[in-house]
Amino acid sequence: MSRFGLFLCKKHGKYNKLRRSVSKYSLWRRATAVMMVLALTAGLTACSGNGKTDGTQSADEVQLYAWPLGSSSPEDTVTQIYAEKFADEVDRLSDGKMKINVYPNSVLGGDRELLESCKDGDIPFVVQNTAPQVTFMKDTAVFDMPALFDNIDEVREHVDNPKFMKLMQQVYNDAGYELLGYADQGFRVMTTNKKIESLADFKGQKIRTMENSYHMAYWKALGASPTPMTFSEVYIGLQQGTIDAQENPYEVIVSNKLYEQQDYVVETNHLPHLISLIVSDEFMQGLSDEQQQIIREAAETAKQYAREQSDERIASKIKTIEDSGTQIITLSDEVHEQIRKECQPIYESIEKNVSSDIVDAYLTQ
């Protein structure tokens, strides 16, 4: 039996019921982002006469320029809350000697550009969803296994498992980053104009997804027709009937008013929407031990704060949706179990592409 199958069997007490189942990077955009960062910091950097010849900076020195943190997300999101809390904590813990400026809305580049620039140390800090990272770090696909968890607290317990975090930190280190933690925006859910209460109801639904093979495989397994589409086109796509449905966390659904074009929100809870905070490993190694400790401590505080904010905001977003007249559908345990059975080939595919140690650690509480 696959690790995923065994996990689900143990989790749901069904040992006898589950069968064995086993473009080239855009250089000009990156250059533009780097030039923007240099322009933002050059004046202040020039005023600093305390540079170390060994490339490190003493914690006692006053930082005369702010390190940039890039994000592709809008301001009114948990991603921004996570980033700003981290920057505030770094400032507080260093008594104002260490400064970070947050640049949301893809000001410094999209997800791919941010990852490239972070690796090189041009944009030392990045906060982003884990989905775009699969191209750079294939083991992050472990987060793409669908329909495993009943609630977000359970997800957090598995993500925070020390053994799992140690393995994932090595994955990021090998790619040129240091992983500082994972916050989240709860689960991803589906919106549609069709009342969906059974597995058969998903059939034929043309649903917008991210361009991620595992995400698309999930919807195909349910009988839907996944359609990758640029996010900026989703609202008008729903409005014009180009697509029937879409999937996102509650935060995105409300901030972009997608519920205005849909009659139902279906709590598929198929994937947790995890948000990573990463730093360039090269940049981090150039800091003093004290500065590194400040950054790690600030990241832990920011993670916990972002999770608390996420829980509060989701409750508020649900109320906004319900007040608009859009109905929220909670699927039965039976339907969730049927979905898990349909996902067995996806679990098998992920097992083939992700380190078995990482899979085992993620499935262990």
Residue spans for each PLM region:
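Short, low-complexity disordered leader/linker segments with a strong preference
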Residues: 1-66
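N-terminal secretory/targeting leader peptides
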Residues: 48-153, 163, 172-365
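Short beta-strand-centered segments that line the small-molecule binding cleft or hinge
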Residues: 157
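Short, flexible, basic/aromatic active-site loop/helix in glycosyltransferases
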Residues: 169
